[in-house]
Amino acid sequence: MNQVVLYSMKGCPWCDMMKDALKQANIEFRDRDIDKYKKEYDMFVEATGNEYVPAFMLMKLEGETIKDVRLLAPERDYDDIHEAIEKVKNYL
């Protein structure tokens, strides 16, 4: 089983565009508001050096065991959002 986690925040137009693009691509994802999931997001920032949203954590799971994790922090532009969607599709 694979899992897509999207880190986002309220009032972020890029986050809204990314959510819409994921929905249009029929990609299931867990939306993590960085204000509610601060500890989790802080670990993401520490691992990537990226403090901007939207950002992804992609995980391959076998049962409860994480077999692979990819971190993805696309630039905030229209083309990169769609490129990020393609990377997510290819990972899944």
How should each PLM-predicted stretch be described?
Residues 1-30:
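Local sequence-structure signature of Cys/Sec-based thiol-disulfide redox active-site neighborhoods
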Residues 10, 32, 44, 69:
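Conserved short-loop catalytic and cofactor-binding motifs
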